[in-house]
């Protein structure tokens, strides 16, 4: 239940026979069966069932992949490869020694979307997986060096990449118990920075005392996503006019491969904070994803209403008693909403008097919307929203 994209279940045994296999989409306010197939399961056979394709272009389908139950020979690893990336063309897949020249090698397989290899056994050891468009030497995915352990029995599926980086695919590697993503070796991490301190001047953001990530960012502005190498960083937030004036010194952050983050400078200039939030920018064709973050110390504890008409007198808040915290910013997470017209109203906790009222918002399926509540620009002013993602996207 609740299986997200690029997630695989463990492998389990069932009796032979014919089974009705269905996939139910979890939609805002409702569920609907979107895929169904009758599959006959035979003895001594492995079945891996993929949901592949695209909801947006109505190409969603079930893809059963089979293999004969085969023990892994001692000293070997066993692999089955599936092309499950609907957005990728027919490709050549190379599995070579890490230092092999691609021009000297032959592809293990040429595969179009939905193709799968048989089980392939290779000596355990270090390998490199590279993918090119069929007939081309232009590498669009490079795993770098990966280790195939003695006795490993792996299902490797090329899936559409929805993380950071330029590769069109991410490999999903399943061992029968769990699954992990194998990113292209050149995949970065994405980070954007939000200036949410109303009484602070324009700032520069510097990583590891040398890398200027952001220059002259003023309140209440935000950057676009910046691609950086995955690593541990120490972040300084300094005055743009004089970098010797340090507001935030050596804030430790870890940026992981393929992930996206929002760093929010918040609180007040006398006690500045830097919070790092992990983002989930993958778009879902059947819903609008909405996220609200509380970064306004002046607002205190708030109630957040999401309604169809802006009237809150007789309704309960969608999120009640949301506090501003210097430990970790409170947020709603990504809330799935059906496409349509909405009004977001923020009040002091227990009050029906609006501190923030967005007015009418038209939210579209397949879009992501983020709003950050921060202090008003002037002392005593009401809180305001910094809008990100598709709230401010250019049509």
Where in this protein do the model-derived segments appear?
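Intrinsically disordered, low-complexity polar regions and short flexible loop motifs
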Residues: 1-395
């Amino acid at each position: 239940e609740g299986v997200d994209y690029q997630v695989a279940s463990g492998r389990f045994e069932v009796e032979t026979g014919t089974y009705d296999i269905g996939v139910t989409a979890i939609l805002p306010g409702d569920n609907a069966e979107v895929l169904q197939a009758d599959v006959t399961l035979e003895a001594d056979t492995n079945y891996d069932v993929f949901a592949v394709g695209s909801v947006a272009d109505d190409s969603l389908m079930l893809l059963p992949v089979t293999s004969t139950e085969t023990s892994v020979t001692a000293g070997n690893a066993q692999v089955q490869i599936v092309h499950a990336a609907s957005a990728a063309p027919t490709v050549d897949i190379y599995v070579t020694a890490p230092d092999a020249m691609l021009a000297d090698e032959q592809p293990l397989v040429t595969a179009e979307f939905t193709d799968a290899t048989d089980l392939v056994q290779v000596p355990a050891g270090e390998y490199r997986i590279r993918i090119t468009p069929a007939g081309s030497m232009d590498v669009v995915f490079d795993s770098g060096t990966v280790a195939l352990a003695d006795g490993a029995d792996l299902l490797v599926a090329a899936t559409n990449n929805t993380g950071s980086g330029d590769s069109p695919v991410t490999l999903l590697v399943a061992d029968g118990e769990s699954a992990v993503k194998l990113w292209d070796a050149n995949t970065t991490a994405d980070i954007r920075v939000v200036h949410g301190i109303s009484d602070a001047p324009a700032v520069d953001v510097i990583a590891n005392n040398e890398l200027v990530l952001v220059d002259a960012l003023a309140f209440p502005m935000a950057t676009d996503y910046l691609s950086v190498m995955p690593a541990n960083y120490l972040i300084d937030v300094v005055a743009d006019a004089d970098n010797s004036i340090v507001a935030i010194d050596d804030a430790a952050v870890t940026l992981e491969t393929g992930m996206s983050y929002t760093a929010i400078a918040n609180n007040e200039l006398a006690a500045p904070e830097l919070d790092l939030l992990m983002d989930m920018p993958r778009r879902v064709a059947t819903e609008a994803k909405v996220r609200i973050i509380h970064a306004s110390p002046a607002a205190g504890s708030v109630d957040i209403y999401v309604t169809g008409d802006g009237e809150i007198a007789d309704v309960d808040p969608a999120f009640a008693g949301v506090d501003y915290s210097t430990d970790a910013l409170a947020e709603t997470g990504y809330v799935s909403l059906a496409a349509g017209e909405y009004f977001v109203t923020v009040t002091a906790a227990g009050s029906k008097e609006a501190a923030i009222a967005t007015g009418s918002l038209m939210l579209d399926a397949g879009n992501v919307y983020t709003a950050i509540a921060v202090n008003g620009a002037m002392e005593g002013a009401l809180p305001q929203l910094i809008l990100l993602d598709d709230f401010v996207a250019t049509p």
